[in-house]
Amino acid sequence: LMVDFSCALKLSMPIAVLSAMREASTYHLTVKGGRFLEAVSQADTFVFDKTGTLTYAAPQVASVIPFNGEQEDEVLRLAACLEEHYPHSMAKAVVAEAERRGLHHEERHSKVEYIVAHGVSSSVDGKKVVIGSHHFVFEDEGCVIPESEEEKFDALPEEYSHLFLGVGGVLSAVICVKDPLREEAGEIIDGLHKLGIPKLVMMTGDSERTARSVAQTIGIDEYYSEVLPEDKANYIRREHEAGRKVIMLGDGVNDSPALSEADAGIAIRDGAAIAREVADITIGANDLYALLTLKRVSDALMRRIHRNYRRIIGFNLM
């Protein structure tokens, strides 16, 4: 005699998923479907964007280091003149610092060219002016460090992110920006390890030195510096080819390609609108403890589904 309990299967699994999604919502977690909870439970790799996820995304200028005989206030004034056109939190920090110092600027530059995930390029008094990442200023634009100032450049503080300002092909200033790590960042990394995630990766547009310092501080397994938006998505594709399940956590426009490429993309609620739209799961901005809750809820869901399956099928074996 064979008894058909397929109706029990058809009922128990959707109910378990809906119950898990409802439980997640009580912790301010928005999940767009049960398969994303399954992906979180099965994931063996978590990829974090640094700015806005592991940090508070409230950067402030810590110091301005002039090069090539430039004056500190003048290079900050010039940087703010360009950065006010750039929709990025670090750019806003530069503009805010110039305003705090009373450095009001006139629009002396020509048309501004905004290069996504790189920086800003324009022309002032017939000279090309660029500001942005190390890769953009030195590799893409070919700027050089002034002679005899290499040692000064090498001594840049590692604990800060850096914006590089080049004028006429020569480095004119480095703006050091502090964006403090979330207090719970190290605890979250440790907690995810204990919950069975073997590989935690950080990606950032910051320099190698800054990325290394952050990774060592919070105990991240792998880190990649000076990455572009396409680099994050390409990394996830390579992990998929290696048979790994990948979760991506990000909050910015630049994270959107990687969020859509991951098995489940997680966005911060107060991040960029496009990141929230692309992401499969949204967490609150107050802290990262929701990640540990999400992992526990996902694991509990999969245990419940497997337990129900065994019990229902077991009736047919009796």
Can you name each region flagged by the protein language model?
Residues 1-48, 192, 215, 221-225, ...:
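Hydrophobic alpha-helical transmembrane segments
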Residues 54, 273-274:
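Conserved switch/coupling elements of ABC/ABC-like ATPase nucleotide-binding domains
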Residues 1-8, 249, 265-272, 281-285, ...:
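Hydrophobic transmembrane alpha-helices
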Residues 1, 13-22, 60-63, 93-98, ...:
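Re-entrant/interfacial helical elements at transmembrane boundaries that shape
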Residues 6, 13, 203-206, 270:
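Conserved phosphate-coupling serine/threonine residues in phosphotransfer and NTP-handling enzymes
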Residues 32-254, 258-264, 296-299:
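Cytosolic catalytic headpiece
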